[in-house]
């Protein structure tokens, strides 16, 4: 893998449901308190259902709610080919609903000096995601779209790039450079259904090679292909503190984590996606790396722990 994480190689949803957050915390033992350097900022008292403030070392960060997706436990989207009863048992053991898999959609905002970074942009108004709350979440965070300087895209799926354009087709973030891997951009350019989006954002796009350091000392791309050919995770660093932005490495806080070998319908290279998922979860668990999971129960902050031959998600709240 191209990126070193602590000396180890590193190689993808309904209105919020109360039991989502409870289940996330209850899937394992009680989560350990965050280190002082990761404690919420003084602005945490202003947190609400759509904006959750926290710290990455000296950096201010905000989890931004955009929407939710419900996927039925029918073996057609998640846990492809697995008996639904087996999936239901896994969900029940974690205190999660057994007939449906709830996924959140939450882009990440990070303030890094004069730069304001946004990681993915949500789904916008697509019906299946019940998204489009990102503009309101940004307002709650006190950030105007024009103030975003850099956008880091994990991959080209609608629930990650849907917020790049405003309803009128104009750039939603007119002053932002849009960073994504060269492979992922090539895939977008070749997709006829993405033609309008590609045309609109092309002047703003800056591509990178796998594992590139994008903002020295702050943001590094993590090789994580498989879900899509150019999918990237991101490692955000401030001093000794780090946060791993997962993208779509793992979709569900129980199924994707406790059974990383189970795939989802949207993994374009399922065997590679399974391997990358296990590699990334293993390294994050071994190193105790703090994780931001885009689709886990809001706000998606926590860590992975090894449990037997698999893993478990330990949420911070």
Residue locations for each model-derived region?
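Cap/insert and terminal regions of metallo-dependent hydrolase folds
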Residues: 15-17, 128, 239-317
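Active-site metal-binding loops of divalent metal-dependent hydrolases
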Residues: 66-67, 121-124, 156, 183-184, ...
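C-terminal motif of bacterial Sec signal peptides marking the signal peptidase cleavage site
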Residues: 10-12
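Divalent metal-coordination and catalytic microenvironments
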Residues: 58, 110, 120, 148, ...
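Active-site metal-binding motif and surrounding structural segment of the metallo-beta-lactamase
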Residues: 105, 113, 128-179
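Histidine-centered catalytic micro-motifs
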Residues: 151-161, 224-231, 292-299
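Metallo-beta-lactamase
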Residues: 14-135, 139-143, 147, 172-228, 240-247, ...
């Amino acid at each position: 893998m191209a990126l070193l994480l602590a000396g180890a190689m590193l190689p993808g949803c309904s209105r919020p449901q109360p039991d989502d957050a409870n289940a996330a915390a209850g899937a394992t033992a009680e989560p350990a308190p965050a280190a002082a350097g990761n404690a919420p900022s003084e602005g945490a008292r202003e947190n609400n259902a759509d904006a959750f403030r926290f710290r990455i070392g000296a950096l201010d960060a905000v989890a931004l709610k955009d929407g939710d997706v419900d996927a039925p436990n029918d073996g057609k989207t998640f846990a492809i080919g697995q008996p639904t009863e087996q999936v239901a048992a896994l969900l029940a053991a974690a205190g999660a609903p057994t007939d449906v898999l709830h996924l959140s959609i939450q882009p990440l905002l990070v303030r890094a000096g004069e730069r304001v970074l946004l990681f993915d942009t949500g789904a916008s108004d697509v019906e299946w995601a019940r998204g489009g709350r990102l503009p309101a979440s940004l307002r709650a965070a006190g950030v105007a779209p024009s103030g975003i300087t850099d956008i880091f895209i994990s991959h080209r799926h609608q629930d990650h790039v849907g917020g790049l354009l405003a309803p009128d087709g104009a750039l939603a973030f007119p002053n932002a450079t849009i960073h994504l891997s060269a492979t992922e951009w090539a895939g977008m350019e070749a997709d006829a259904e993405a033609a309008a989006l590609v045309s609109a954002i092309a002047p703003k796009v800056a591509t990178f090679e796998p594992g590139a350091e994008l903002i020295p000392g702050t943001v590094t791309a993590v090789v994580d292909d498989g879900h899509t050919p150019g999918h990237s995770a991101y490692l955000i660093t401030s001093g000794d503190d780090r946060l791993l932005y997962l993208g779509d490495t793992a979709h569900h806080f129980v199924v994707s984590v406790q059974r990383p070998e189970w795939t989802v319908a949207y993994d374009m290279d399922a065997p590679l996606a399974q391997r990358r998922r296990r590699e990334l979860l293993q390294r994050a668990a071994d190193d105790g790396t703090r994780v931001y999971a885009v689709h886990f129960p809001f706000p998606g902050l926590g860590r992975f722990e090894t449990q037997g031959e698999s893993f478990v998600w330990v949420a911070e709240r």
